[in-house]
Curated annotation (Swiss-Prot):
Function, in words: Catalyzes the thiamine diphosphate-dependent decarboxylation of 2-oxoglutarate and the subsequent addition of the resulting succinic semialdehyde-thiamine pyrophosphate anion to isochorismate to yield 2-succinyl-5-enolpyruvyl-6-hydroxy-3-cyclohexene-1-carboxylate (SEPHCHC).
Source species of the chain: Escherichia coli O8 (strain IAI1)
EC number: 2.2.1.9
Annotated GO MF terms: 2-succinyl-5-enolpyruvyl-6-hydroxy-3-cyclohexene-1-carboxylic-acid synthase activity; magnesium ion binding; manganese ion binding; thiamine pyrophosphate binding
SS bond partners: none
Domain of life assignment: Bacteria
UniProt family annotation: Belongs to the TPP enzyme family. MenD subfamily.
Keywords: Magnesium, Manganese, Menaquinone biosynthesis, Metal-binding, Thiamine pyrophosphate, Transferase
Protein name: 2-succinyl-5-enolpyruvyl-6-hydroxy-3-cyclohexene-1-carboxylate synthase
Cofactor(s) this protein requires: Mg(2+); Mn(2+); thiamine diphosphate
């Protein structure tokens, strides 16, 4: 009996089972213990294979692929700390709804806790963050193949969002020629190998039912808050709110067109919050709100009813409103709850939104971070997509820009970390094949710098804007101690990215004005390669401009 041959047959059943649940993209890191999984994936023609040498980046690459494809994405890594590097992406997926399947190779039980190399306690290491965790036994013909495939089917068939951790111990030898070992074991699955359906099919979960009193509430004064959603959902939500005559407060990730732009500016005006107090119902569609003033208003508002609609399960309201938590696909929910044509009830807010936008436009000429955030719509590629980083840049775009309705926008706004942003953007581009504009800060770019290796492989033009404000300038907006702000919060690194781009053979520009930036974009969109555009700005101008605009709009 060949141990290596049976390891591969065992792994082949696992990998084939994944294909029955829509897995097409599979991300693989180098490693020896994961050889059975890697070879099984390589031999399965259903998969699109992605590789990366850094497991943390690999996890975020899978996250980006899952964001766009809306399908589960598998990741294969070897044993040891390689597994731990998947933690950040797993956490983000659980909060933002992507499906990740983590196949982690492991040493067999007799090599754990005895000083063996690269052997750690992997079962349960992700605590409660996976939706399902499976600790498989060492491959053995004593366990029927139907147990293995039905175990995988159960986990994936009941997976709605988040990750599945499948820990896979393999004994040595890991290498060797294939023989007939385990062939009859594998063949007991019969015509399943020629089929394309799961061995075990789980019934789909029930969606939220229609709210029977919706016809009552839609006649009231309402407010629509739009969080993260798909481009198609964003367009539908905008039309729905317009028909109802309800003001729509759209987040940067809502893709609604933000019909009342600069919400995070005008929500700081007492006239706006006073008018919003008249709302009898607030319907929040989608989660992960960005703006500070929006979050403050959301926490303080007290309508008669506060409804949250999202297909992610669990509590999504940090303000703990009285109301309803409705688990449903947003587009499906809108269809069940049609709008009735009514006149807008808000008068003051549209005026304030227009005045806030004019205040932003009046400052657009200076070459700076805040101005770039406002102008970002001018640089979006046709039939493309936008990936927005975290920290200051996403807040500036949210407050100062007005993204077009239905234009795809992606971000990691679950745990809102700055780790893995470039890797996620790479996955977003690969899954869609669209021209992509990604924008991050300098510390975010440094944090995931080796992901520039992933950006060498793109199928359409990708522009990475690195806004270099020399540190974490988001802390300039917070009451951090002035005496220790630079040393312990901002942490300026005094670096530039020209040599990093050169190391990975990426095109690079460092424009000094708007004309040079536009020229760089025109050049970048011509070829299916990655271009790094480093925009060096004054350290504090972005944060200061936002604070000045907040003060100005609050007194309108």
């Amino acid at each position: 009996m060949s141990v290596s041959a049976f390891n591969r047959r065992w792994a082949a059943v696992i990998l084939e089972a994944l294909t029955r649940h829509g897995v097409r993209h599979i991300c693989i890191a180098p490693g020896s213990r994961s050889t059975p999984l890697t070879l099984a994936a390589a031999e399965n023609s259903t998969f699109i294979h992605h590789t990366h040498f850094d497991e943390r980046g690999l996890g975020h690459l899978a996250l980006g692929l899952a964001k766009v494809s809306k399908q589960p994405v598998a990741v294969i890594v070897t044993s040891g700390t390689a597994v731990a590097n998947l933690y950040p992406a797993l956490i983000e997926a659980g909060l933002t709804g992507e499906k990740l399947i983590l196949l982690t190779a492991d040493r067999p039980p007799e090599l754990i806790d005895c000083g063996a190399n690269q052997a750690i306690r992997q079962p349960g290491m992700f605590a409660s963050h996976p939706t399902h965790s499976i600790s498989l036994p060492r491959p053995t013909q004593d366990i029927p193949a139907r147990w293995l495939v039905s175990t995988i089917d159960h986990a994936l068939g009941t997976l709605h969002v988040g990750g599945v951790h499948i820990n896979c111990p393999f004994a040595e030898p890991l290498y060797g020629e294939m023989d007939d070992t385990g062939l009859s074991w594998q063949q007991r699955l019969g015509d399943w190998w020629q089929d394309d359906k799961p061995w075990l099919r789980e019934a789909p979960r029930l969606e939220s039912e229609k709210q029977r009193d919706w016809f009552f509430w839609r006649q009231k004064r309402g407010v629509v808050v739009a969080g993260r959603m798909s481009a198609e959902e964003g367009k539908k939500v905008a039309l729905w709110a317009q028909t109802l005559g309800w003001p729509l407060i759209g987040d940067v990730l809502s893709q609604t067109g933000q019909p009342l732009p600069c919400a995070d500016l005008w929500l700081g005006n007492a006239k706006a919050t006073s008018e919003l107090q008249q709302a009898q119902i607030v319907v929040q569609l989608g989660s992960s709100l960005t703006g500070k003033r929006l979050l403050q208003w959301q926490a303080s508002c007290e309508p008669e009813e506060y409804w949250i609609v999202d297909d992610i399960e669990g509590r999504l309201d940090p303000a703990h409103h009285r109301g309803r938590r409705l688990i449903a696909n947003i587009a499906d929910w809108l269809e069940l709850h049609p709008a009735e044509k009514r006149q807008p009830w808000c008068v003051e807010i549209p005026r304030l939104a227009e005045q806030a936008m004019q205040a932003v436009i009046a400052r657009r000429d200076a070459f700076g971070e805040a101005q770039l955030a406002h102008r970002i719509c001018d640089y979006l590629p046709e039939q493309g997509q936008l990936f927005v980083g975290n920290s200051l840049v996403v807040r500036l775009i949210d407050a100062l820009s007005q993204l077009p309705a239905g234009y795809p926008v992606y971000s990691n706004r679950g745990a809102s970390g700055i780790d893995g942003l470039l890797s996620t953007a790479a996955g977003v581009q690969r899954a869609s094949g669209k021209p992509t504009l990604a924008i991050v800060g300098d510390l975010s770019a440094l944090y995931d710098l080796n992901a520039l290796a992933l950006l060498r492989q793109v199928s359409a033009p990708l522009v990475l804007i690195v806004v270099n404000n020399n540190g974490g300038q988001i802390f300039s907006l917070l009451p951090t101690p002035q005496s220790e702000r630079e040393r312990f919060y901002l942490m300026p690194q005094n670096v530039h990215f020209e040599h990093a781009a050169a190391m990975f053979e990426l095109k690079y520009h460092r424009p000094q004005n708007w004309q040079e930036l536009e020229t760089a974009f025109a050049d970048a969109w011509r070829t299916p390669t990655t271009t790094v555009i480093e925009m060096v700005v004054n350290d504090t101008d972005g944060a200061q401009t936002l604070q000045q605009l907040l003060a100005q709009v609050s007194h309108l």
